[in-house]
């Protein structure tokens, strides 16, 4: 298993968060990112059988069942992501029944995904219907 900190998708997310903060686009905890990852991107870095915990989604996301997302945490600041990604980000997989996020990595302080994740996931569902290469929602 490769070290998660060496994953290109994680480093891209850390750089994006740092740049958005540096440019003043997301002050304090004013923005969020959800990055849809291909299973092949994550398989070298995760034990797919090791679910750290389940976090209820509060809606039916079955359409995204089995999909992986790297997501900013609730109440987290973009400026802190690069220094401590494992606290400020989480890598989740949508459960088979679409009711939960299976935490695979991150949110090590007991945190959870942004409260806006349902809106992000609904946006991903809609965009994927018209663009199969779609992979990010950010604001």
Show where each model-derived region lies.
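Conserved mixed alpha/beta catalytic, RNA-binding, or beta-rich assembly cores of soluble enzyme
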Residues: 137-138
């Amino acid at each position: 298993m490769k070290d998660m900190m060496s994953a290109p998708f994680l480093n891209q997310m850390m750089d994006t968060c740092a740049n958005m903060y540096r440019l003043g686009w997301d002050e304090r905890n004013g923005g969020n990112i959800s990055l849809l990852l291909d299973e092949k991107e994550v398989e070298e870095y995760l034990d797919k059988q090791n679910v750290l915990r389940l976090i209820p989604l509060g809606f039916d996301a079955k359409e995204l069942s089995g999909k992986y997302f790297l997501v900013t945490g609730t109440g987290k600041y973009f400026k802190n992501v690069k220094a401590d990604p494992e606290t400020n980000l989480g890598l989740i997989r949508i459960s088979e029944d679409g009711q939960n996020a299976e935490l695979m990595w991150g949110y090590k302080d007991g945190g959870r995904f942004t409260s806006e994740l349902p809106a992000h996931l609904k946006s991903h569902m809609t965009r994927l219907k018209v663009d199969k290469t779609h992979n990010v929602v950010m604001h």
